Amino acid sequence: MIQKNWQELIKPNKVEFTSSGRTKATLVAEPLERGFGLTLGNALRRVLLSSLRGAAVTAVQIDGVLHEFSSIPGVREDVTDIVLNIKEIAIKMDGDDAKRMVVRKQGPGVVTAGDIQTVGDIEILNPEHVICTLDEGAEIRMEFTVNNGKGYVPAERNRAEDAPIGLIPVDSLYSPVKKVSYKVENTREGQVLDYDKLSMSIETDGSITGEDAVAFAARILQDQLGVFVNFDEPQKEAEEEAVTELAFNPALLKKVDELELSVRSANCLKNDNIVYIGDLIQKTEAEMLRTPNFGRKSLNEIKEVLASMGLHLGMEVPAWPPENIEDLAKRYEDQY
């Protein structure tokens, strides 16, 4: 069955996001097949930084200024520095059409992003960000062009051929994701100790949460990779797709080596040919204690694990073991 190429790979049963304020989030996903932590971490990082859409200033027009190499009387920063500061304004904007924003201020004082007058569908996310500083008697008026896009667009590409004199193009940093880092560690699943654990830190400009950013990046990868799938997935027979009505708890189909038992306890169960939880719970305490090298400490450990699942030793299970137990275990694995 070709489906086994992807169906039998382990998938994370733990995907947790922890937010730290408006702009920072941490993702932990485990377990992953060996090597998949690096594969997924690197792919997600690249897409997060390059391919998500956001808003940015594309051009600015400053009253009395003809080009970016000018200076403005009474303004401490020259126009080049002002343009660099404008690049760092964090913006959230709905819609795809270009919008205008205006700021007008008299000195003395500092001009910040919070001084900008915006329309209803534009939000300044870092209003404390400094644009320039005015001396006594100085005045400045700037009009910004804002657009939506993705990635990084240099000023030259924002320069329109029919642009009026004095319209200064700006490098546009559209990506709402500012920083992404990740690390891969070993993690345990059952008795397997070398699965991957992916930890990722995401910092955004506040226009999107880290969790949503990862979801969008994953969807982009899913869409891009889908074009390489050159086959239709084989259809199972109708009777195979129908879920068999079980006479017992599906959790009994879970293998005991997936329980987080000590090595000693796990080896004792293996030596006694106890493969599934359904095999285990039918044993009595006395039967377990007669198992070679199995002591009271191992017994208490197993009783505690079973109790956490609502089970205990000495249970009667009708119709156990079922026919095709391995197929049933795979079919019901999402239910335990």
From Swiss-Prot:
DNA-dependent RNA polymerase catalyzes the transcription of DNA into RNA using the four ribonucleoside triphosphates as substrates. It comes from Rhizobium rhizogenes (strain K84 / ATCC BAA-868) (Agrobacterium radiobacter). The lineage of its organism: Bacteria, Pseudomonadati, Pseudomonadota, Alphaproteobacteria, Hyphomicrobiales. The gene is rpoA. It catalyses: RNA(n) + a ribonucleoside 5'-triphosphate = RNA(n+1) + diphosphate. Its EC number is 2.7.7.6. Coiled coil: none annotated. Keywords: DNA-directed RNA polymerase, Nucleotidyltransferase, Transcription, Transferase. Residues 1-232 are annotated as: Alpha N-terminal domain (alpha-NTD). This is DNA-directed RNA polymerase subunit alpha.
